[in-house]
Design a protein with these regions (language model features):
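Sec/Tat-exported extracytoplasmic proteins
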Residues: 10, 15, 22-28, 56, ...
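Extracytoplasmic/secreted proteins, especially bacterial periplasmic and envelope-associated proteins
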Residues: 5, 10, 20, 37, ...
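Pocket-lining segment of extracytoplasmic ligand-binding domains
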Residues: 18-20, 28-29, 58, 95-187, ...
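Bilobed "Venus flytrap"/periplasmic-binding protein-like clamshell domains
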Residues: 47-114, 228, 232-237
Length: 252
């Protein structure tokens, strides 16, 4: 949604998933007929981990076990939906083999708890509030992504990286979870001036500790990591900031 709003100049800044940004900017994937431009990158803020949640008593222990199950893959045209579809396809599970449904995270968590669905995908920063709230109400577990699947995903999309959800991130989760992650990227409209964006970029890094208190995810803000996993050009204002710190980024 943020990408479309930016491209139509309804908003001046927004956060979106790196792989979705790449497709929107280049007119590929779900944006093949609706290319969205008019924005550029400022910085990657934090990794969004792909979390596949099932009930602890479900008997589902791997992605292969989702065969024939009801699975929420996130809202339509969302980054979560794109990631979920890719992972299911790479595991040989097409739409015909899995009953995929499009629910937001809150709805999906409720339906998993009531037994109306068997699993749901959630691509978000840790610790995801809705998952922690669910974990406190009923026993859940997470499905790991195999090394072969993650390697295939990373070779197809350079925006994905291996990621480990540490043990005890959530209530009752005593083992680490192997998965993949994609960066949540801060974007700026092309209409924002270079001076404004350069100042915003500087503020972002100089006050990262203060900003951490205002968000529920673990911000990972340093200039070096903030430019990784982004395939679209950076805003000229951000480019100027990074140049001052001897960091080369993609520009037009």
């Amino acid at each position: 949604a943020n990408i479309r709003l930016l491209s139509k100049n309804y908003i001046e800044m927004g956060i979106a998933q790196a792989d979705l940004i790449n497709d929107a900017y280049n007119g590929t994937g779900i944006f093949v007929s609706t290319q969205c431009s008019g924005y550029k990158a400022i910085a990657a803020l934090y990794p969004e981990a792909c979390q596949i949640v099932v009930h602890n008593d479900s008997g589902i222990n791997s992605i292969d076990d989702l065969l024939g199950k009801k699975v929420s893959i996130g809202e339509s045209d969302s980054g979560t939906e794109q990631t979920a579809n890719l992972i299911l396809q790479l595991n040989g599970l097409s739409d015909k083999l899995v009953d995929t449904l499009n629910y937001d995270y809150t709805t999906a968590a409720g339906k998993l708890q009531s037994g109306e669905i068997d699993a749901f995908f959630c691509t978000a920063g840790l610790r995801t509030t809705i998952i922690e709230e669910l974990a406190q109400q009923c026993p859940i577990k997470f499905l790991s992504i195999s090394d072969s699947c993650s390697k295939k995903l990373e070779s197809a999309y350079d925006t994905y990286v291996d990621y480990t959800i540490p043990a005890n991130t959530y209530t009752g989760q005593t083992e680490e979870i192997k998965t993949v992650a994609v960066q949540a990227v801060l974007l700026a409209s092309n209409e924002l001036s270079d001076i404004v964006v350069e100042s915003l970029t500087e503020f972002l890094f100089e006050h990262s500790a203060d900003l951490q208190y205002s968000v529920p995810v673990n911000l990972q803000l340093d200039e070096t990591s903030a430019v990784k996993g982004i395939s679209i050009p950076f805003h000229p204002g951000a480019v100027k900031y990074y140049k001052k710190h001897n960091i080369k980024v993609k520009s037009e």
